[in-house]
Amino acid sequence: NIPALIQCKEIQEDWDGKMAVVDGYNACVYVDPTPDLLESLKKRQQEDQKKLALLAELKGKPNTTLDGKTVQVFANIGGMSDVGAVQQNDAGGVGLFRTEFVYLNCTDYPTEEYQFEAYKQVLESLAPKKVVVRTCDIGADKTVDYMKLDHEDNPALGYRAIRICLTRKDFFKTQLRALFRASAYGNMSIMFP
């Protein structure tokens, strides 16, 4: 729960020794905040901590709607580093395992064995909970140099995800083999982006 801001404009390097407060709600960094602003931010932080404490009291209890329907709450993950939060927060499983992060963490195409181990670790750690794995969604906002994708004016609608998988079949088959092998170690479903 550490707030972070990206693509910040007008960052100055002469902030050494100055207090800075990151406000993730409003995407702001306050340098040398006024006492009133600091007090306001501290108050909001305390309110957040109270809300988290209330949510913690719900852990382990059924997720039931006002009309009596029980629902499962699933988490989204990018890999093994997120599994602890799934377990800690009592998620019913994983609704989206973004496998492109396996690719983003590599400097070359990940091997079948490398992928198998990554998927197996997650599945074993969460078994018997369901894990919905999305095949590689590279392209648009997530790219890797080794794939050598051409620039597109509108990459969100262009050559990405399943389109890449269907034209680079060796790449796709490697991932599918790794997923099929790993499926023996947990409750896995596969979705295609």
What are these regions (language model features)?
Residues 1-89:
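Acidic, glycine-rich flexible loop/linker segments
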Residues 52-193:
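Conserved alpha/beta-domain cores
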